[in-house]
């Protein structure tokens, strides 16, 4: 399947801005399941400097600077992406058990495991804590498949938390989300990662695009 993705980010300032410096990560990655065939980023007003690079995690970073006064900024990223079918087994009980994964994370010296251990560590918005471990611990029994346990945790968060766009900001701590049981997708992703890391598993945040299909007869 081929997709043409157009992502527009626009800022309108209350007063004139004399200078701005930005990093944009708006280009889909090429992975085993998808290929970014081509992409471009257009910015208005005119740029004084631009540079592209790949960061530590493999993301494409577009760095730019504007040195003229402006009251609005528009960044338009256009990408053509081809995806490949995913062959997935719907039996969630298959795969390694929670105990097997934890043992491998602790004992294996393989390159993949050593790289994965980085995602056991705390990050700026996600810190392991007893409250997150206790919230999920009963789901991750030793002999249960890790995949099944992760799906169960996703279902628990979906059932027990309310989607509320005004309840949080990008700086709201997870402890507050946990207490109020409200937030948005970013908060719930952070919560699930915190639960997994608090139990000793490796987990990381991935963002992207989801294709949505409207009800019959309605526009997309």
How would you name each of these model-derived features?
Residues 1-134:
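Linear, non-domain "peripheral" regions
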Residues 100-104, 109-183, 191, 198-199:
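Secondary-structure boundary elements
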Residues 26, 94, 170-174, 202, ...:
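Flexible domain-boundary/linker segments
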Residues 35, 50, 179-183, 211:
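Alpha-helix boundary/capping detector
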Residues 20, 155, 161, 187-220:
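Hydrophobic/aromatic-rich core segments of domains that either
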Residues 30, 34, 45-47, 62, ...:
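Short, surface-exposed, charged/polar-biased interaction segments
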Residues 54, 179, 204:
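Short glycine- and Lys/Arg-enriched binding-loop motifs that mark or flank ligand-binding interfaces
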């Amino acid at each position: 399947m081929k997709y043409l993705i157009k992502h527009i980010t626009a800022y309108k300032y209350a007063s004139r801005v004399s200078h701005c410096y930005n990093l944009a990560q708006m280009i889909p990655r090429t992975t085993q399941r998808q290929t970014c065939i081509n992409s471009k980023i257009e910015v208005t007003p005119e740029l004084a400097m631009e540079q592209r690079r790949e960061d530590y995690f493999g993301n494409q970073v577009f760095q730019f600077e504007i040195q003229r006064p402006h009251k609005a900024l528009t960044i338009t990223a256009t990408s053509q992406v081809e995806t490949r079918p995913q062959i997935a087994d719907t039996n969630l009980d298959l795969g390694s058990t929670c105990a097997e994964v934890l043992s491998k994370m602790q004992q294996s010296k393989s390159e993949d495991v050593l790289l994965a251990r980085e995602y056991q560590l705390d990050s700026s918005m996600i810190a392991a804590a007893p409250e997150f471990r206790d919230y999920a611990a009963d789901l991750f029994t030793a002999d249960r498949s890790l995949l099944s346990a992760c799906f169960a945790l996703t279902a628990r968060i979906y059932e027990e938390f309310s989607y509320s766009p005004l309840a949080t900001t990008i700086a709201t701590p997870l402890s507050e989300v946990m207490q109020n049981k409200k937030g948005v997708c970013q908060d719930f992703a952070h919560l699930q990662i915190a639960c997994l890391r608090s139990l000793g598993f490796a987990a990381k945040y991935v963002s992207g695009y989801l294709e949505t299909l409207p009800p019959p007869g309605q526009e997309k």
